Amino acid sequence: MAKRIIYNENARRALEKGMDILAESVAVTLGPKGRNVVLEKKFGAPQIVNDGVTIAKEIELEDHVENTGVSLIRQAASKTNDAAGDGTTTATVLAHAMVKEGLRNVAAGANPIALKRGIDKAAGFLVEKIAEHARQIEDSKAIAQVGAISAGNDEEVGKMIAEAMDKVGKEGVISLEEGKSMQTELEITEGMRFDKGYISPYFATDMERMEASLEEPQILITDKKIALVQDLVPVLEQVARSGKPLLILAEDIEKEALATLVVNRLRGVVNVAAVKAPGFGDRRKAMLEDIAVLTGGQVITEDAGLKLENAKLDMLGKARRITITKDNTTIVAEGNEKEVKARCEQIRRQMDETDSSYDKEKLQERLAKLAGGVAVVKVGAATETEMKDRKLRLEDAINATKAAVEEGIVPGGGTTLAHLAPELETWANENLQSEELTGSLIVSRALLAPLKRIAENAGQNGAVIGERVKEKDFNTGFNAANNEFVDMFEAGIVDPAKVTRSALQNAASIAGMVLTTECIVVDKPEPKENAPAGAGMGGGDFDY
């Protein structure tokens, strides 16, 4: 395919145009008075969302060069989402502001490589400052505040997440599922999460989120390597007749057997997913036994005289729901409280008997996984469209609270970044020279962008609000919900430090890369040829 090559200023301007389009459509959602965006779907009802990364993933432009700009800035959003699970809109707005400011300097003749070095040094300084200003989370009230802000100022959601964290612990698993009623409810159930994902991405049932969701599945638990599909055929036939999904937990599945499972899954013969067993050696056997107790199944192992080809349905475990991503598996079980408690007691006794601190630590991990359970938030809404929006907001809120527990909280609403701008200017003037100094000042001017946008979405003058916030002390910011200047910690308007840090780092990274671009190579669109006029068919230009 022929390529189109664009150089210098033209290349950067084309990228900028794509970025403008994406940044504007994402920025309208920022802040308590941010609006929603409607996404048209090829199948089903349109989706109404308020989540930056979901909007960014949907935007695809006709012009290949502009589309490259969209992809670059989308990366800032998705990397922030991967690292912190929230703050995607902030990352997009920041990256866009840095690129805009930087391109002005490049057009005026500044050296892009020196600017990039300045941007990187500024980002390093700001990361340290964010860590300095972060406060550790002490109580569930602070957790509720973080959750409420991330869910779009929904205090009920904040309280629910704080309650869930109280019950399953800060490291515990909080899972989301679609509820059957109008109310959003919280339920604590048995379950566990371990850090092994699906063996093949073809097992994913939701291609957009790349995860496999199995409702009321059967679970085959074995500690052997499955090399031949013949070993599995008897079980697969029994499960296919029962019409339920199947999860296979094994040491490994070799290529031939895996290929057969994938083909059967894609053809719809049996809804199956396969996951490698967690842990190593004796710990793997112990963890498989934990999972068997949790799901009411048996570990099919030759140590107990059980063979795969002789496995029956009543040897398989059962669960309410299993969610598998590329990195981890969450099992939501139910109804085995007695057995789970007995197993926990057994692990506690082992902990008392062992002298090895390593073994104690590993037993403690197993106990936490088994005893902690899973908090299930059942999302309720009047319509399916509202349900999907609420689910995305709740997901953001859960991620944000976990990030807040990890690295603490800072004043929210764009306040932290706005207050750090003068500090960065002072530091840069003392420590950097010439174009590196210009690079760091690009960042300092861009730091006000999220606050300005939040104010503009609330109908205020962003530039004026930004300057007024800079004059006040560090914890004072602009509450866009009622247009007042308040102490952000007291008002409960807080952001996780990890979210602010990730958004800043990813924005600086993308901005630096865009500014140093001097040439773009993209595919040239092929001209569409009209169909030749044929007997009775008509040419491509005729109306029928």
From Swiss-Prot:
SUPFAM superfamilies: GroEL apical domain-like, GroEL equatorial domain-like. One of its GO terms (molecular function) is ATP binding. It catalyses: ATP + H2O + a folded polypeptide = ADP + phosphate + an unfolded polypeptide. It is found in: Cytoplasm. GO terms for cellular component: cytoplasm. Its main location: cytoplasm. GO terms for biological process: protein refolding. ATP binds at residues 29-32, 86-90, 413, 479-481, 495. PROSITE patterns: CHAPERONINS_CPN60 (PS00296). Its EC number is 5.6.1.7. NCBIfam families: GroEL, PRK00013.1, PRK12849.1, PRK12850.1, PRK12851.1. Belongs to the chaperonin (HSP60) family. Together with its co-chaperonin GroES, plays an essential role in assisting protein folding. The GroEL-GroES system forms a nano-cage that allows encapsulation of the non-native substrate proteins and provides a physical environment optimized to promote and accelerate protein folding. Forms a cylinder of 14 subunits composed of two heptameric rings stacked back-to-back. Interacts with the co-chaperonin GroES. This is Chaperonin GroEL 2. It comes from Trichodesmium erythraeum (strain IMS101). The lineage of its organism: Bacteria, Bacillati, Cyanobacteriota, Cyanophyceae, Oscillatoriophycideae. The gene is groEL2.
